[in-house]
């Protein structure tokens, strides 16, 4: 397999963070992944736009090759880590791109540290916090909550599993297809390989279940409600997948939720990826659709 797109480094601190740099641009976009993922989720973006734009991919605490403490997980902790990374990189401010939970981290960073965040790219993440109690939820809100819970349950399940080979890990994600790593596009294969660490008896996902289970309620309880989003003072690009976690499922950000975001946020660019789901939107065929609309020219300078 070819050399990695990323040059990896460690950001010092009480919780050491792994980052990857793609390209040498002086103003890189800082990329934040989902709740059980890692920075290689942005491989396609790094391949197509790293050389010209410059990207920094982050392994959030508890994921990838970053440290995995037993406690200390929350949106606030991740936002503080983002600023620590900017300090390490010598950046006074940066554009943040966040997929899934990474979108919530990006929003929290913009609210907590407005002078450090110049623009946000929300990739199927960062929707408003639901303020209704379960008994007050509409039927649509209940269905959305159930779909989110089902998607997270599948992602969390693998964190307790040991796989005898990388191919067995692919069987978890693509059941019945008998795939080998060589069958996948190179950037996707690299994502799955980096996602695994060797353990006794085989391979295990690097993401910490403790981290994921702590961050999940933090997202649902401390992310901004629609009105609180008015505190985000920077321009926003919103990229949505037309499907949720599973093919054919309802999108995580529906048209109604999008309308709730459009009022308080300064959304300069909006893209709906027809045919993409929450995961495949980062694959090459869809990255080639949304990334030029965001980066070429940069939406925040239009």
PLM regions and their residue ranges:
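Conserved HGGG/HGGXW glycine-rich cap/lid loop of the alpha/beta-hydrolase fold
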Residues: 18-71
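A catalytic-pocket lid/entrance helix-loop region that shapes and gates access to the active site
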Residues: 123-163
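Catalytic histidine neighborhood in serine/cysteine hydrolases
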Residues: 262-275
């Amino acid at each position: 397999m070819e050399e990695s797109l990323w040059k990896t480094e460690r950001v010092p601190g009480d919780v050491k963070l792994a980052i990857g740099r793609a390209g040498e641009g002086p103003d890189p976009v800082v990329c934040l992944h989902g709740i059980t993922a890692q920075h290689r989720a942005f491989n396609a973006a790094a391949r197509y736009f790293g050389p010209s734009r410059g990207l920094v991919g982050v392994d959030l605490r508890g994921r990838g090759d970053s440290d995995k403490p037993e406690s200390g997980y929350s949106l606030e902790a991740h936002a503080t880590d983002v600023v620590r990374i900017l300090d390490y990189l010598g950046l006074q401010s940066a554009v943040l791109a966040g997929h899934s939970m990474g979108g919530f981290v990006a929003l929290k960073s913009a609210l907590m540290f407005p002078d450090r965040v110049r623009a946000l790219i929300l990739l199927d993440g960062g929707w408003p916090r639901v303020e209704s109690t379960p008994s007050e939820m509409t039927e649509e809100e209940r269905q959305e909550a159930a779909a989110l819970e089902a998607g997270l349950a599948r992602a969390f399940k693998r964190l307790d599993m040991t796989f005898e080979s990388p191919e067995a890990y692919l069987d978890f994600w693509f059941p019945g297809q008998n795939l080998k790593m060589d069958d996948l596009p190179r950037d996707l294969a690299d994502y799955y390989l980096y996602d695994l660490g060797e353990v006794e008896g085989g391979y295990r996902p690097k993401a910490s279940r403790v981290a994921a289970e702590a961050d999940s309620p933090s997202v649902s309880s401390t992310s901004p409600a629609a009105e609180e989003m008015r505190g985000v003072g920077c321009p926003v690009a919103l990229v949505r997948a037309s499907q949720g976690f599973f093919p054919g499922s309802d999108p995580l950000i529906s048209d109604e939720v999008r309308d709730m975001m459009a009022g308080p946020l300064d959304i300069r660019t909006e893209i709906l990826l027809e045919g993409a789901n929450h995961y495949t939107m980062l694959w090459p065929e869809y990255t080639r659709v949304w990334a030029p609309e965001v980066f070429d020219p940069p939406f925040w300078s239009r």
